[in-house]
Amino acid sequence: MIKTTKFMDNFYILDDGMVRQFLITGEKEALLIDTGFPGCHIRDAVSAVTDLPVSVIMTHGDMDHAGGLPEFGKCRLHKADWKLVSGDIELESLAEGDVFRCGGYRLETIEIPGHTYGSVAFYDREKGLLLPGDSVQKDGPIYMFGSHRNLDLYIESQKKLCDLADGIKTIIPCHHDYPIGPEYIGRNLEDAIAMKNGELPGTPHPEMPCVVYRGRWTEFYGEGEAI
């Protein structure tokens, strides 16, 4: 069941306990960021807040974010992640610099490939609000295994976000604790570099085909062999 929380003016967090989505309500339309797992009834949760027409934009194409797309049929998603989406969905491109205005928010699209090749963040510079999808988290785990992920790109994207950190006040990840501060960008980066350099001990995940790496701040599910 999705729990809906009004976090700021016109800004709602829709959370099923495993992943969260974000709904912004304006005067004439609403904006939904991500759609959750398949079968989560995200449309019902949105309709409980507003009856406005809804546009959908995506932080990335993983199943736990794109699973509710059939309830809407259309979204904006970075082209690099189109192959992750199945079903009869009308996909429109999403790229660096695309801006979405709704309900007093101005969300700028920032490409941050790594967690997936098509990962993006949405950033409201005036409010200092960053919606990074899965790419910035407190503790983790951050998934970095599989053919649609790239650790080198993830590291470069974290560096890109670090350049914005002075203006960021609030980060709301799609998983685990929220809100968090901009210091977690640097913490995730520090541990990602350590993982790349082979400095983190790893243990086999008991259920998934990956290795669990635990850094100083962040846990990653990555490639490689257990140490």
Q: Language model features by range: what are they?
A:
Residues 1-48, 121-133:
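Conserved beta-strand hairpin/beta-sheet module of binuclear metal-dependent hydrolase folds
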Residues 28, 51-53, 168:
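A general structural motif
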Residues 34-37, 60-61, 105, 115-116, ...:
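Active-site metal-binding loops of divalent metal-dependent hydrolases
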Residues 37-108, 138, 191-198:
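Active-site HxH/HxHxD metal-binding segment of metal-dependent hydrolases
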Residues 42-45, 154-157, 161:
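A general structural detector for well-ordered alpha-helical segments in enzyme core domains, enriched
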Residues 112:
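Conserved SAM-binding loop
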Residues 143-158:
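A short alpha/beta connector and helix-capping loop motif
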Residues 159-227:
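Accessory terminal helices/loops
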